[in-house]
């Protein structure tokens, strides 16, 4: 079904082949994004200062919090589009694209305005040190003002993933990453704009990537062209998108909220400790990218096969994803002995290097369990059940992780707080396994029947 045009039908053929083929461009794109993040950290850490490096780290969960609602809608759109595409109903795919873009046009600007208004209260709640406060404020104000481009890019990517196309999203991301790096170097090294330059480079690059993606999709796939101002809105279909997307968005918001609460505790130990966490978390995030790409691939794979009512293929795809993810999580343990060397690339401050290396030693073993939880939750989301992920986040990330982080940090010292993050993942993994084995996530069936 339109596979020659880059739209991949995953309801036939090898499950492993489809998942790996779909995941590879996502992985390449994620490496590009992380490469940019590391260049960003290198530029900020070496040419602006550790205070600015801490400020950028503080900003990450805040930005994720603001964008997560529309990212959830995008995920809901991906699942709905994938199921209709797998069921062979292009006219319903068309309806879903129009509906989700109408929601974006009506809601993105108000969200950006709200985000700008909430920057100062959130920084106060995060207890950001005076040394990093001004730079964190500038960074967040600029990025929040430009959230429209970030949300639009994610929406384009979500539509294409639902259609089985992950290669084109790599092109969009390549445009954004290359432009971002060039502008970073220009604004920071040449214009000397500091953190403002880093933030401005980000929003310009993402806005251009969004508009480029819009033009590309409309020319390459006229049957599924994006019409931002058509204002075609299918209310029943939007309810279905929100049934899947709203819990997904709230789940991501809870992840961001939990990260912000943890970040508040991290900030209380000084900007060297915050900078170390920022660099260490970038390193483990990069190592996690293959698992993240497989989990993203399984959403579209499960969605298409649920739409086609092929449960046996769904189960096979989930098994392939789980085994591959656990194997890679084991490989990730190599970051522990390499920690000091890798942290030293971003900062020459001994306290930052030491604290960053300890972070990797504490957190990396828990990724074995986190990979299982992440893949199972994504697979069940592809089947139309995203409510469980939200409930799991409330239980494991808010009710377990946050209290454990504070308890361990206060009782045993700052380094032990990272075990609180790991304990949250242990609980989340156990809940995901039990729920997946229960089979309750299959209850929604194929959207094509509705």
PLM regions: where:
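Small-residue-rich hydrophobic transmembrane alpha-helices
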Residues: 53-113, 150-169, 263, 277-338, ...
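Residue-level signal for short hydrophobic patches within transmembrane helices
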Residues: 12, 16-35, 39, 62-69, ...
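Transmembrane helical elements of multi-pass membrane transporters/channels
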Residues: 21-40, 142, 153, 176, ...
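Transmembrane alpha-helical segments of integral membrane proteins
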Residues: 374, 400-409
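Helix-terminus/linker motif at the lipid-water interface of multi-pass membrane proteins
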Residues: 31, 35-53, 123-130, 186-193, ...
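Short runs within selected transmembrane alpha-helices of multi-pass transporters and secretion channels
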Residues: 74, 142-161, 169-177, 198-213, ...
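Short alpha-helical transmembrane segments in multi-pass integral membrane proteins
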Residues: 1-23, 81-148, 190-246, 302-366, ...
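Transmembrane alpha-helix boundary and packing residues in multipass membrane permease domains
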Residues: 26, 30, 42, 79, ...
């Amino acid at each position: 079904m339109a596979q020659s045009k880059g739209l991949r039908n995953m309801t036939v053929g090898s499950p492993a082949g489809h998942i790996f083929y779909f995941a590879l461009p996502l992985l390449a794109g994620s490496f590009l994004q992380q490469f940019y993040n590391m260049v960003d950290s290198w530029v900020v850490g070496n040419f602006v200062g550790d205070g600015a490096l801490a400020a950028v780290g503080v900003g990450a969960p805040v930005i994720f919090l603001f964008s997560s609602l529309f990212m959830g809608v995008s995920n809901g759109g991906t699942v709905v589009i994938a199921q209709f595409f797998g069921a062979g109903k292009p006219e319903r795919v068309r309806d879903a694209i129009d509906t989700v873009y109408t929601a974006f046009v009506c809601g993105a600007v108000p969200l950006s305005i709200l985000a700008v208004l909430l920057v100062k209260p959130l920084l106060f709640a995060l207890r950001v040190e005076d040394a990093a406060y001004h730079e964190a404020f500038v960074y967040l104000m600029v990025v929040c003002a430009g959230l429209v481009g970030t949300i639009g890019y994610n929406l384009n990517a979500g539509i294409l993933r639902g259609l089985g196309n992950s290669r084109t999203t790599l092109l969009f991301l390549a445009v954004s990453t290359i432009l971002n790096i060039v502008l970073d170097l220009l604004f920071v090294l040449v214009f000397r704009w500091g953190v403002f330059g880093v933030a401005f480079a980000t929003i310009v690059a993402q806005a251009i990537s969004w508009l480029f993606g819009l033009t590309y999709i409309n020319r390459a796939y006229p049957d599924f062209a994006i019409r931002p101002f058509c204002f075609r809105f299918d209310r029943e279909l939007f309810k279905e998108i929100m049934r899947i997307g709203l819990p997904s968005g709230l789940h991501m918001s809870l992840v961001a909220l939990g990260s912000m609460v943890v970040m508040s505790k991290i900030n209380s130990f000084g900007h060297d400790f915050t900078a170390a966490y920022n660099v260490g978390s970038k390193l483990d995030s990069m190592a996690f990218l293959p698992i993240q790409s497989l989990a993203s691939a399984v959403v579209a794979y499960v969605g298409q096969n649920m739409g086609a009512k092929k449960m046996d293929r769904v189960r096979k795809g989930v098994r392939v994803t789980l085994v591959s993810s656990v194997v890679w999580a084991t490989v990730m343990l190599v970051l522990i002995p390499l920690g000091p060397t890798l942290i030293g690339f971003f900062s020459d401050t001994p306290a930052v290097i030491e604290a960053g290396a300890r972070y990797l030693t504490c957190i990396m073993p828990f990724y074995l369990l986190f990979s299982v939880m992440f893949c199972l939750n994504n697979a069940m989301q592809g089947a139309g059940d995203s409510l469980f992920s939200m409930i799991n986040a409330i239980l494991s990330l808010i009710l377990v992780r946050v209290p454990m982080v504070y308890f361990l940090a206060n009782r045993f010292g700052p380094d032990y707080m990272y075990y609180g993050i790991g304990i949250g993942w242990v609980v989340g993994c156990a809940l995901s396994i039990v729920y997946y084995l229960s089979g309750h996530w299959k209850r929604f069936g194929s959207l094509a029947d509705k």
